[in-house]
């Protein structure tokens, strides 16, 4: 089994950019970024329960990581960067910490939560996500989306932006979204911070300037934060040009070493490059 995906810019011989969307999204939402990052080949993936992978279901994040590896193997992708937003960012971080990372060049995470520290926090989140999942299964999706985008993390959205998101997301399958929300809930996710801090892979944590919650989270967890100006939680959608500029700059720090295949150099180069970026 593998996920539905599409390849772009495959004539390039650099490592692939593998784009993982958030809950309620689909692979195609990354296309503006794919076009702006055309010096790398790109693979956009529809996650389980979403887009053309609506009928795919995973039981947890570990199975999701295995499915990601199977998809990459089927596409014959041997070297790749993971770029993930929100749920996609959590999947990417979990994969880097606990999955098969052969060929993984690095992580670019946008607003992904690295986990909840206490069991009580995880239990509360499980209840929260089960409630939303129940609504996605049983209520008209436009009604649920209208409430979903009233959550504090989306407070920077203008009314017209909120309505546009509802219009785009209303084609989702409620059961598919609900299954993914429950089975990959933040309440099931391990506390990834200690493992993330030990990674030798290049890693940057991207966050909108107006997304105070995730900026605070990144600083509290000592993640390598880089802010995108004048945008909130969904930075890549709000300002694709600025987001792509940061992505391209970060990748440019490592392009030559992959051309010359020097993995040992990457391990020593990364801290200095990150200091220059931030």
UniProtKB/Swiss-Prot annotation:
Reaction(s) catalysed by this chain's protein: 5-enolpyruvoyl-6-hydroxy-2-succinyl-cyclohex-3-ene-1-carboxylate = (1R,6R)-6-hydroxy-2-succinyl-cyclohexa-2,4-diene-1-carboxylate + pyruvate
Signal peptide annotation: none
Keyword Lyase recorded: yes
Keyword rRNA-binding: no
Xref: Pfam families: Abhydrolase_6
EC number: 4.2.99.20
Gene Ontology BP annotations: menaquinone biosynthetic process
One example GO MF annotation: 2-succinyl-6-hydroxy-2,4-cyclohexadiene-1-carboxylate synthase activity
Pathway: Quinol/quinone metabolism; 1,4-dihydroxy-2-naphthoate biosynthesis; 1,4-dihydroxy-2-naphthoate from chorismate: step 3/7; Quinol/quinone metabolism; menaquinone biosynthesis
HAMAP family in the record: MenH
NCBIfam families, A to Z: menH_SHCHC, PRK11126.1
Functional note: Catalyzes a proton abstraction reaction that results in 2,5-elimination of pyruvate from 2-succinyl-5-enolpyruvyl-6-hydroxy-3-cyclohexene-1-carboxylate (SEPHCHC) and the formation of 2-succinyl-6-hydroxy-2,4-cyclohexadiene-1-carboxylate (SHCHC).
Subunit comment: Monomer.
Protein's UniProt name: 2-succinyl-6-hydroxy-2,4-cyclohexadiene-1-carboxylate synthase
Species of the source: Photorhabdus laumondii subsp. laumondii (strain DSM 15139 / CIP 105565 / TT01) (Photorhabdus luminescens subsp. laumondii)
């Amino acid at each position: 089994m593998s996920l539905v995906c599409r390849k772009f810019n495959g004539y390039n011989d650099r490592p692939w950019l593998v784009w993982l969307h958030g809950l309620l999204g689909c692979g195609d939402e990354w296309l503006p970024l794919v076009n702006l990052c055309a010096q790398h080949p790109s693979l956009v993936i529809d996650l389980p329960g979403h887009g053309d992978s609506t009928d795919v279901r995973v039981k947890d994040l570990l199975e999701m990581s295995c499915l990601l590896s199977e998809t990459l193997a089927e596409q014959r992708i041997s070297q790749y960067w993971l770029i993930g937003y929100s749920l996609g960012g959590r999947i990417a971080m979990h994969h880097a910490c606990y999955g098969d990372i052969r060929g993984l060049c690095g992580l670019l995470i946008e607003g992904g939560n690295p986990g909840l520290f206490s069991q009580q926090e995880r239990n509360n989140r499980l209840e929260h996500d089960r409630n939303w999942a129940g609504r996605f299964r049983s209520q008209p999706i436009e009604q649920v989306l209208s409430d979903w985008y009233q959550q504090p993390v989306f407070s920077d959205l203008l009314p017209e932006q909120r309505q546009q998101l509802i219009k785009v997301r209303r084609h989702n399958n409620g059961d598919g979204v609900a299954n993914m929300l429950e089975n990959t809930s933040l309440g099931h996710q391990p506390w990834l911070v200690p493992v993330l801090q030990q990674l030798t892979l290049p890693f940057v944590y991207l966050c909108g300037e107006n997304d105070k919650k995730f900026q605070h989270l990144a600083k509290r967890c000592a993640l390598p934060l880089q802010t995108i100006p004048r945008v909130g939680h969904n930075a890549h959608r709000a300002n694709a040009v600025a987001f792509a500029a940061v992505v391209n700059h970060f990748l440019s720090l490592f392009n030559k070493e992959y051309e010359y295949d020097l993995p040992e150099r990457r391990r020593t180069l990364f801290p200095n490059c990150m200091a220059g970026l931030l």
